[in-house]
Amino acid sequence: MQLSNSLRSARSAAASSGCALASRPVVACRRVTPSVTRPGPFTIATGPLLPASRSKAGGGIRVFSSALYEFGQQLKEDLDHDLSRARVDAIANKTRIAELEQQRRILMAVGGMADDEPELKAALMQLEEILGVSFNELQLMLAETLADHPAKMDNLAAMAAVVGTGSDGGGDESGDRDTADAADADGDGGERAWLRFKADVHACLADLRNRKDGITLHRAIVKDMVRASSNPGARRSSSSVDKMARQELDRLMPFLLDDFLDKMPGLKAAFTGKAEPGAEGDDGEGEEEGEAQDVGEDAVDSSSSGGGGGVLSCAAWQQVLGRTVRAVSPTLALVLARGYLAMAPRQYRALALVRMILPGKTGGGVDGALTRKEGLSLLKKLRPGISGLADKDKQWLEWVIARLAAEFAVQSAGDGHEPEPKRPELPPTAVQRKPPAEEQHKPTAGARDSPNM
């Protein structure tokens, strides 16, 4: 009984569990064979990210656009334009310079200048445009004379580098000089020449500001002035002058210059021809005082004749450089020799043109490019009879060459056989070569060139 009951209960439990299991096949079937289809796994597209019309090369896509980018592009275009224009201008300038060089070669090769004067003036006008230098009629006449004598031009090619200071020798002050020349005929020409000389020295020293070595020369001249000055307010030591700035030197030099020139022994007498009251030479000899008076008379005579315009004559200029200025301040003598063209008569100042019409020539110069050997060679060309130069320093050669080259430029142009012109006296240290024995008793023009100077 109990067994049948247990079996019956087991069957009922199995039947109930079977009903439960019978209701689950649907769920089990969903897992094996789902009734709803799901999408497949996610895949990355391999096609272009951008549209085909915009992904092509050269499609004009601007990756970055801003005001800075626009400015950079404009700046690049402007620089390219300026560079192209500069290249064109440089080529044009080189072509023009080559044409002028050819003009110069033609002029140097021509024996006579009668038919070539228009070409010379045209070349000078072109040089005026390039160099910014004005040429007056007197300079044109000198250029024609030089071109008419190629041998003289060849010598002056080297001399111009020594004497030419870059000044156009122009006519800015010509009106003032003409007025002063007219006044000299009515009054004391020597005194006016002395005042004009002092003004020219001021201008010559003021020009040192524009020179590369100007501060060095400026300082050396101030040292000489301080050393010779008796003014208590101007007393300075050499070390203090070395420490001065350019502005302080510029203020001190004009304060000392007039007194320095007035007290320089024999300098004023070279202009006025009058012996200085109470002046005594260092060597106690009266010979130099007499020579200074003679030289001063020559200077006044030359100014009254209209040739020098109240400016130092050749001999007087040599006196200033050799006997006075150089003895007190060698640096000042060198600076004045450099600036001689600005202080000389107009026909001498025209020598500055030589440097302009010979741009292709290479030469020396008082700034150091002229070697001692070149200076000796050039000096012997200017003065073939000079000797005794072995012990002369380079500075001595520079200011003597500067003086003689100016004289050489204005010698009268003849057929090449003209008599030897009168030459200025050299310093007493220069020894003249004696003429041969058979010529010593002949009265020649060279007799006035005495070796005892």
UniProtKB/Swiss-Prot annotation:
Coiled coil: none annotated. Residues 279-300 have a biased composition (Acidic residues). This is Ezy-1 protein. The keyword Signal applies. It comes from Chlamydomonas reinhardtii. Keywords: Signal. The keyword Signal applies. Residues 167-187, 272-307, 412-453 are annotated as: Disordered. Residues 415-425 have a biased composition (Basic and acidic residues). Residues 1-28 form the signal peptide.
